[in-house]
Amino acid sequence: DATMGKGNDTLFLCELAGEKGKVLAFDIQQEALDVTKELLKTHGKEMQAELILDGHEHMDRYAGKESADVICFNFGYLPGGNHNLATTYRTSIEAIGKGLGILKHGGMMSLCIYSGGDTGFEEKEKILEYVKALPGKEYTVIVNEYYNRKNCPPMPVFIFKE
């Protein structure tokens, strides 16, 4: 889980991984780690996850090449948190690139791009430019849009590594 936030995706990934699986979850805010730790403990999943207080752009320090089946991102800021602490396109694109190296062949990366806020529109544009340029023989990129929602709905993007 490249962007831990409140821990919901971390919990979901722990459930998918099963007892033998391991989930690495990243965030730069201690608040996110504390909330996630409590959520995992409540559900008996705290031993399946390693909660890492570090930026997602450093995930290659913690995971080996082609070692992950799934990598999830939710760009933006911590729900209910400080809006001044948000993802930026530079570190997000760096993290996506490193994540693609960590992803196994046949693996999937999900990106949930929120385009509101001060940096969200630029981040969305830059991330979409980046994923559009990925080699088609190595990756399949699927971009989804909500057509009937207002106020900058999130944009789900899926990248499958061939």
Describe the residue ranges of each PLM region.
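Conserved class I S-adenosyl-L-methionine
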Residues: 81-85, 110-129
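Conserved beta-strand signature within the Rossmann-like core of class I S-adenosyl-L-methionine
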Residues: 3, 102-113
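Mobile active-site "lid"/loop adjacent to the S-adenosyl-L-methionine
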Residues: 72-95
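Conserved SAM-binding motif I beta-strand of class I
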Residues: 22-27
